[in-house]
Curated annotation (Swiss-Prot):
It comes from Desulfotalea psychrophila (strain LSv54 / DSM 12343). This is 7-cyano-7-deazaguanine synthase. One of its GO terms (molecular function) is ATP binding. Zn(2+) binds at residues 185, 193, 196, 199. It is an enzyme of class 6 (ligase).
Amino acid sequence: MVDSIIVLSGGMDSAVLLAQTLKEGKTAQAISFDYGSKHNDRELPMAVGLCEEFAIKHQIIKLPFIGELFSSSLLTGGEEIPDGAYGQENMKSTVVPFRNGIMLAIAAGYAESVQAGEVLLGSHSGDHHIYPDCRPEFNNAFAEAVNLGTDGQVAIRFPFSEMTKRDIGDLGRTLDLDFAKTWTCYKGGELHCGVCAACDERKEALRHPEGLDVTKYLV
């Protein structure tokens, strides 16, 4: 039996969520998904490393059908990842159809199986503009569906839903989280590219202009 199942991508948001959950004294396991994204090969090792550091059980679930059947520039074989800010129309190409719904459903089933009372996802207020399955309306409806579908045994929670990514970065710093052990860049190169929307957001969140960001960028 465990308190929480954390959906851990290996990115900064879910890493902070993991650290904060453990600081609260909860027991936790992490679940990650290999769904064929261009940055899975960079993110997943970060997730593995975080779980080893925090000494928690970690499951990686392979979802090859997403890469095979779905269309998104975020997926291997998709069009090129666009540069620019999240607010731009072209960033909608990075939406992976119903990704969070699929992952949360699996996490909820796993949580019920191991008698964990909650599933935690690190989506934040800045995700809402582009990604339909990060919006409060979706989160609330899906949480209710899981509550009904598990007969009240599993709650889906979004602790950072009212926070900005910068808020999350600041919280992680108070937790002494090493952000060099997290991955954000959508392009999945050896280093963070520094120009895609995800990198732009990371730079702002980690206060790069103030010299507080430990990330190594190409640009």
